[in-house]
Swiss-Prot record:
The keyword Cell membrane does not apply. This is Ribosomal protein L11 methyltransferase. GO terms for molecular function: protein-lysine N-methyltransferase activity. S-adenosyl-L-methionine binds at residues 160, 184, 206, 257. Its main location: cytoplasm. GO terms for biological process: methylation. It catalyses: L-lysyl-[protein] + 3 S-adenosyl-L-methionine = N(6),N(6),N(6)-trimethyl-L-lysyl-[protein] + 3 S-adenosyl-L-homocysteine + 3 H(+). InterPro entries: Ribosomal_L11_MeTrfase_PrmA, Ribosomal_PrmA_MeTrfase, SAM-dependent_MTases_sf. PANTHER family: ELECTRON TRANSFER FLAVOPROTEIN BETA SUBUNIT LYSINE METHYLTRANSFERASE (PTHR43648:SF1). It is found in: Cytoplasm. Coiled coil: none annotated. Keywords: Cytoplasm, Methyltransferase, S-adenosyl-L-methionine, Transferase. It comes from Agathobacter rectalis (strain ATCC 33656 / DSM 3377 / JCM 17463 / KCTC 5835 / VPI 0990) (Eubacterium rectale). Its EC number is 2.1.1.-.
Length: 323
């Protein structure tokens, strides 16, 4: 299926008026591009480690919308858009108001990413996408299959690999099968690795409800009993009901492959989740945030026992010492 993309050059002052006008005409799927700087509140809400530098804001905005290119005459719709644009001139500076057009394919965005995800190994563990066959040379490896679906997490990212290496170390080295809390479980890859390595129970949390579906599906693909995993939607940082559901002093390992700006405010709630002697394994930490995360973990009362690097990413492992 093809789509016509129409882009209106306007001003940042008019972009909201323009969007409202298009929606009143029944047009959905509106896209706004501008260089308005983000506020500190916006940046905090985004939970990202660094922002790309934007060009200077010159007050120009591009408002785009899409109409299915089914061969029908679109001139009437465009006429209404142009009339609406002219009406707005009485209210706000709409700038040039020039409308340009282009064609775009209806790409299968849910599946196109698959060409970038292929099998890889971490030690003796083979992590492969569900749609890929096992290569003969990998037939004797310990296999985990993952289909992230529309949730985040194939396992190939350095931060996930750092966490997996630590899970291998601390689960295989445990005297008894551990219980694991996976914060920000995503596709469930770390929960599944933990269970495959011998964890007796996994609890996972994520802000995205779609992750619950992906995690359950991936557990089934890996022939894991669903009773071994319990998963909740919510924010462990400040959701007291979720904290009650997750429990206190219950876990031998808490693993969190999330961003530094999430780990820092989350650190104070981790000690209460861990048993004495339990481990907090975390990554998703860009290198220039290492000290800040380390200080937050130590301030929460945990002892940092190991720091590992892979590329520009960092793993910090800490322990809750016995009293």
């Amino acid at each position: 299926m093809k789509w016509k993309k129409y882009t209106i050059e306007t001003t940042t002052a008019a972009e909201d008026f323009m969007s409202s006008m298009l929606m009143e005409l029944g047009i959905e799927g509106i896209e706004i591009e501008d260089n308005i700087p983000l506020t500190k509140e916006d940046q905090a809400d985004m939970f990202i480690d660094f922002l790309p530098e934007l060009p200077p804001d010159e007050g120009i905005s591009h408002v785009s919308f899409y109409i299915e290119d089914d061969g029908s005459d679109q001139s009437d719709m465009l006429r209404k858009v142009k009339l609406g644009l002219e009406d707005l001139r009485d209210t706000v500076d709409v700038g040039s108001g020039v409308i340009s057009s282009s064609e775009t394919e209806d790409l299968d965005w849910i599946n196109n990413w698959k060409k970038y995800f292929s099998s890889f190994t971490i030690g003796d563990i083979l992590i492969k996408p569900t749609w890929e066959e096992v290569k003969p040379e990998d037939a004797d490896k310990f296999m985990i299959e993952i289909d992230p679906g529309i949730s985040f997490g194939t396992g190939k990212h350095e931060t996930t690999q750092l966490c997996i290496k630590q899970l291998i170390k601390y689960i295989e080295g445990a005297k008894e099968a551990p219980t694991v809390l996976d914060v920000g479980c995503g596709s469930g890859i770390l929960s599944i690795v933990a269970l495959k390595l011998g964890a007796k129970e996994v609890v996972g949390t994520d802000l995205d409800a779609d992750c619950m579906i992906s995690t359950r599906d991936n557990m089934q693909v890996n022939h894991l009993d669903e009773k071994l995993g319990t998963f909740y939607v919510g924010n462990l940082i400040d959701d007291t009901e979720l904290q009650k559901k997750v429990g206190t002093e219950k876990y031998d390992i808490v693993v969190a492959n999330i961003l530094a700006d999430v780990i820092i405010p989350m650190a104070p709630v981790i000690p209460d989740r861990l048993k004495e002697g339990g481990y907090f394994i975390t990554s998703g930490i860009i290198d220039f945030k290492e000290n800040e995360v380390k200080e937050a973990i130590e301030a929460a009362g945990l002892k940092v026992i190991e720091i590992n690097h892979q590329g520009e990413w960092v793993n910090i492992t800490a322990q809750k010492l016995t009293k």
